[in-house]
Amino acid sequence: MLFIKSLLLLLSLIFAVSNATGYVGFKVDGPGCNATKIITLENGACQTVCTNLYGKVTPTNDPSKFNLNPFIDVDCKTPLMAEQQVTCLPDNKPFKVSTLTVTCIPDTTSSSTSPSSTSPSSTSPASTLIGSIAFVTLAALFALI
């Protein structure tokens, strides 16, 4: 019985970690934007996106979906528009958010996305957090069995 619990726990760890990885940042192109600048995924931190455009990005339970909150002030207190949930597209395909074109940068340590030569090699803090939470939750459930 202990062997089965251990095996299930190991499989849940592998599943949680493999599903927690996804994207580490974004490239934004449009008026006042530098299309070569990578905006790293910093969970909920106010960041400069383009000239006079700031934003917060928060991950969701799906590693390819994010909530975007655009602001017009450097303190991220005055919203430009309502929060939008966006889905990163595979193979570095860009998508539109209002007048901006966004390209998600995949995590090169992830097998669930296509590698990119411009991708950073670090693991996303948000992905690590999601994976840790998923693992701890599954471990607690298996401990109760």
From Swiss-Prot:
Region (Disordered): 107-126
Lipid-bearing positions (GPI-like-anchor amidated serine): 117
Record GO terms (molecular function): actin filament binding
Compartments (UniProt record): Cell membrane
Propeptide boundaries: 118-145
Source species, domain of life: Eukaryota
Entry's Gene Ontology cellular component terms: cytoplasmic vesicle; membrane; plasma membrane; side of membrane
The entry's keywords: Cell membrane, Glycoprotein, GPI-anchor, Lipoprotein, Membrane, Signal
Post-translational modification: The GPI-like-anchor contains a phosphoceramide group, rather than a phosphatidyl group.
Primary localization class, coarse: membrane
Glycosylation sites: 34
Topological relation to the membrane, as annotated: Lipid-anchor; GPI-anchor
Compositionally biased tracts (Low complexity): 108-126
Function per UniProt: Binds F-actin and nucleates actin assembly.
Protein name: Ponticulin-like protein B
Gene responsible for this protein: ponB
